[in-house]
């Protein structure tokens, strides 16, 4: 018998013992009867022995309380071990009841413990004293801060200055709560980080399908194709990585496209390292291979592509037969040969052919993914995701087992207790007329848009967002904050200190993962689940019979949560209900009283989550108790091909069918408890809503696009000024080799590290010890040419200025390209506030438009309530490169195109590691240059509206607000 077999036999009684008591055994990954987690039946009193007390037997009794990690978008389940005596959190582990993460976590999950015990965290509301940017604050009460903020908002609303109110979100971590708050206020004030994150990726999927995110069924795939580093970072790293690994164990092949040798690439069967921005050329070469060789799913293309619309628009004189379309398809893509793709990418024809042949073997079990990566880095990056999905669309691998689904079908957003009407106004600071097809708000250009439009903000919130650090051109943001005529009151809602908060008027402490309420659902497999984040000490006290009315009562200091804060703030904005706001924050159970989070989520779980009542009843619980007990619920184990479902007869009333098979009905849309957003195609001329498509003699559900089918041909792009991009094509990036002068090279700055959290992990000692700096990746060929060795200081010169960084000479980056990771180069402007373990102290110097960030004091050990801070050994915290980047808005998607054209030189005398220089006058020149590529709605709108109304848009205003204003 093998060692594993012997061990299994020895401990088998442990499993039998658990199951004999009628308790749940959670199988460990070893598959040898070791349990991964305590049985859920013992979560009220789990006993562990203190390992440090051995050989004495010292017991620790814990309550295991579920919550959800807030340290990336994956929203993995956590179990907090709450000490029954002290009611403090001892540790965090995975939650085996969470369908997405299935009990597993990356390093960021357990590191939540560092965040809640961080000695430098913000514990009380703070108000600025002295000028903005002085970094001087005093403690104030929540009452004082909330009253001041509410009075400003109330005055702006009553004076019809609704567009001067804005909430700018970083990591949302929730589904729709903040949007509903803004809708209740009647303001178009939602801003997000999406255009520095994923708008490029979203656009490509949206124009195909009417849904803006992929949902790959990795676990069942035969071939997995990643333009990402998905085994180590990204959306949704941990849940996806474990399923990719399972597929590979069953024989699936993994193709990774990444200019960098990422950890993911090291696991690939095929790693392709293309020139940055050439990825769409590669994808289209694979498409061309399938097309020219007839290796695509003809029946799927015939049924589900809008090829008839393509023929009518571009070849009106031809007989619109499928055979003629097939011939045209061959002609359209004939130029995307392996020879062409090899020239663009630098990947050999042989490797491209090998990859195409492998893809062709997948059939409908082809899972692909692109989210940020190349789609976020390049001008025209949205064609990367559009072309990768074209491979799926050719193979018919759309919502199939092992194929790529669409996120709205694998996501569950329960309808809340109130749904306020959407605003009647349009905010041009977020949605400027120059970018009618932008997928999301042009958030990263806010300082430039203020100058461009002459508009201002009375109250500006950031919520877990750090624009001075995260966005390009951070010094322009600092200039905006320093001008009180542009921003009347800036409120930073944040659990941690960040660079932007130093310029705030109020810094208000918000909770971490275990200190707040949220619901969320993400597409991680072909099913649907709902997660519930909760304050774990509150839940623990309630298990012990104590009622908690306010989360501040159980959080450290006076740390609050956005849910309760926004309810309270809304009552202060509209104390008597005369503005029509308070009604959306009143209790239904007790009219006239303030809505509580308990009632908000109880109503949701009771009324909007199919199957939850029954599951709870089976355990003698109500739905709210069930979610507090387990932290997650699987709504559906499998969804399948939604687009191929027949439309029920009761939805077919007085139907009309368009020449291309789009079916319209007068029957009202059935109410759904799932309010996940999708595309919203327009009704027909007589007001019938689109309900499906004709597929043979059946009416099937189809896709939420104008045609109801997958839109190979986008009438939206064609009629809104971009005819040349009506079908998937290749756009040369702004870092294309032909556009580089001698000595210039692309800088890749978008990649993330597995153990860092954007800019929210400077307060996590375990993560910071593992990764705390960001050297410049440079190939030995380039390093030898320049005479550079490991650790040498380099100047990286950009359009705006330069930053000084250490060299890392590695074959992990292709020659002619350099790379520098996200997260690092954190700084603070004094020693009074900030995360001392990862933020160096700097001096900011301004001379007109010229700014210097000069390091003045490094990271060093210090004494605090945590003895580990005296053991800090690292001093190098990297460089803040984003400050030196100009804004690069893609003229179609609106995405900031992150890749930079740079000149790398040896550092000059006096240069210091981490030093940054920027001239914001040059940033204005870059803004104007990129704005020249835009095609404003005034020039291209076919119907005198600002934007196609069917496209997804957060907080979508009323139809009247879409009308273009007079140009006068």
Question: Positions of the model-derived regions?
Answer:
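Glycine-rich phosphate/diphosphate-binding loops that line cofactor/substrate pockets in enzymes
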Residues: 146-164, 214-223, 332, 353-368, ...
């Amino acid at each position: 018998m093998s060692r594993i077999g012997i061990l299994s036999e020895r401990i088998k009684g442990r499993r039998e013992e658990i199951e004999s008591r009628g308790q749940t055994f959670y199988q460990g990954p070893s598959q040898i009867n070791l349990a991964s987690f305590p049985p859920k039946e013992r979560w009220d009193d789990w006993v562990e022995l203190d390992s440090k007390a051995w050989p004495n037997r010292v017991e620790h009794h814990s309550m295991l309380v579920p919550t959800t990690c807030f340290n990336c978008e994956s929203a993995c389940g956590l179990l907090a071990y709450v000490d029954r005596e002290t009611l403090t959190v001892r540790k965090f582990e995975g939650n085996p009841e969470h369908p997405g993460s299935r009990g597993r976590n990356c390093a960021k999950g357990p590191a939540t413990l560092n965040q809640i015990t961080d000695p430098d965290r913000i514990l009380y509301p703070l108000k600025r004293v002295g000028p903005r940017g002085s970094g001087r604050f005093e403690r104030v009460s929540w009452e004082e801060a909330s009253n001041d903020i509410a009075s400003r908002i109330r005055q702006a609303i009553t004076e019809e200055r609704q567009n001067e109110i804005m909430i700018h979100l970083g990591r949302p971590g929730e589904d729709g709560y903040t949007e509903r708050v803004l809708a209740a206020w009647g303001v178009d004030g939602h801003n997000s980080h999406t255009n520095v994150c994923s708008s490029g990726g979203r656009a490509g999927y949206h124009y195909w399908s009417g849904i803006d995110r992929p949902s790959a069924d990795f676990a069942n795939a035969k071939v997995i194709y990643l333009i990402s580093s998905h085994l180590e970072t990204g959306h949704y790293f941990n849940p996806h990585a474990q399923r990719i690994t399972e597929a590979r164990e069953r024989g699936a092949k993994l193709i990774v496209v990444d200019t960098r040798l990422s950890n993911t690439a090291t696991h690939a069967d095929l790693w392709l390292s293309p020139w940055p921005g050439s990825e769409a050329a590669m994808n289209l070469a694979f498409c061309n291979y399938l097309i020219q060789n007839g290796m695509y799913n003809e029946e799927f293309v015939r049924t589900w592509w809008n090829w008839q619309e393509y023929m009518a628009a571009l070849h009106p004189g031809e007989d619109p037969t499928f055979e003629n379309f097939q011939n045209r398809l061959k002609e359209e893509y004939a130029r995307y040969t392996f020879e062409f793709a090899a020239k663009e990418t630098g990947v050999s024809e042989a490797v491209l052919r090998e990859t195409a042949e492998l893809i062709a073997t997948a059939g409908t079990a082809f899972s692909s993914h692109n989210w940020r990566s190349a789609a976020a880095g390049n001008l025209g990056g949205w064609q990367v995701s559009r072309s990768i999905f074209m491979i799926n669309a050719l193979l018919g691998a759309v919502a199939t087992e092992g194929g790529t689904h669409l996120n709205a079908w694998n996501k569950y957003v329960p309808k809340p207790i109130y749904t306020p009407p959407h605003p009647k106004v349009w905010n041009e600071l977020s949605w400027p007329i120059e970018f009618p097809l932008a997928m999301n708000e042009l958030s990263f250009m806010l300082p430039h848009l203020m100058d461009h439009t002459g508009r201002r903000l009375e109250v500006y919130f950031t919520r877990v967002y750090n624009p001075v650090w995260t966005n390009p051109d951070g010094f322009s943001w600092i200039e905006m904050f320093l001008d009180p005529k542009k921003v009347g009151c800036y409120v930073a809602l944040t659990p941690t200190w960040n660079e932007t908060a130093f310029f705030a008027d109020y810094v208000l402490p918000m909770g971490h993962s275990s200190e707040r309420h949220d619901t969320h659902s993400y597409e991680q497999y072909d099913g649907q689940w709902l997660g519930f984040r909760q304050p774990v000490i509150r839940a623990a006290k309630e298990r012990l019979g104590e009622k908690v009315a306010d989360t501040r009562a159980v959080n450290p200091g006076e740390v609050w949560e956005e849910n309760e804060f926004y309810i309270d703030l809304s009552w202060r904005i509209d104390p008597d209900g005369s503005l029509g706001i308070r009604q959306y924050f009143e209790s239904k159970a007790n009219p006239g009283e303030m809505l509580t989070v308990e009632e908000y989520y109880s109503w949701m779980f009771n009324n909007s989550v199919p199957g939850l009542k029954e599951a709870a009843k089976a355990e003698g619980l109500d739905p709210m108790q069930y979610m507090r007990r387990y932290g997650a619920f699987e709504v559906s184990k499998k969804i399948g091909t939604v687009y191929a479902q027949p439309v029920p007869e009761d939805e077919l009333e007085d139907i009309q069918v368009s020449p291309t098979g789009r079916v319209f009905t007068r029957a009202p849309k059935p109410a759904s408890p799932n309010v996940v957003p999708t595309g919203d195609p327009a009704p027909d001329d007589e007001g019938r809503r689109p309900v499906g498509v004709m597929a043979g003699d059946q009416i099937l559900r189809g896709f939420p696009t104008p045609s109801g089918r997958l839109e190979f041909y986008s009438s939206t792009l064609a009629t809104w000024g971009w005819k040349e991009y009506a079908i998937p094509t290749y756009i040369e990036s702004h870092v294309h080799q032909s556009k580089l002068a001698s000595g210039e090279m692309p800088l890749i700055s978008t990649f993330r590290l597995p153990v860092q959290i954007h800019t929210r992990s400077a307060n996590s000692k375990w993560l910071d010890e593992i990764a705390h700096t960001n050297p410049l990746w440079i190939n030995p060929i380039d390093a030898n040419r320049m005479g550079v060795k490991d650790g040498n200081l380099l100047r990286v010169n950009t359009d705006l200025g330069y930053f000084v960084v250490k060299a890392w000479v590695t074959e992990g980056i292709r020659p002619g390209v350099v790379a520098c990771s996200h997260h690092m180069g954190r700084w603070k402007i004094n020693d009074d506030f900030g995360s001392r373990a990862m933020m160096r102290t700097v001096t900011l110097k301004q001379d007109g438009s010229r700014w210097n960030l000069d390091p003045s004091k490094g990271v060093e050990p210090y004494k605090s309530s945590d003895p580990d801070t005296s053991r800090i050994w690292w001093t190098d915290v990297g460089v803040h490169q984003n400050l030196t980047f100009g804004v690069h808005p893609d003229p179609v998607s609106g995405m900031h195109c992150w890749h930079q054209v740079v000149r790398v030189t040896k550092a000059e005398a006096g240069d210091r590691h981490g030093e940054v220089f920027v001239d914001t006058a040059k940033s204005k020149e870059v803004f104007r240059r990129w704005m020249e590529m835009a095609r404003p709605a005034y020039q291209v709108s076919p119907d005198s509206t600002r934007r196609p109304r069917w496209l997804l848009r957060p907080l979508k205003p009323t139809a009247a607000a879409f009308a273009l204003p007079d140009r006068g």
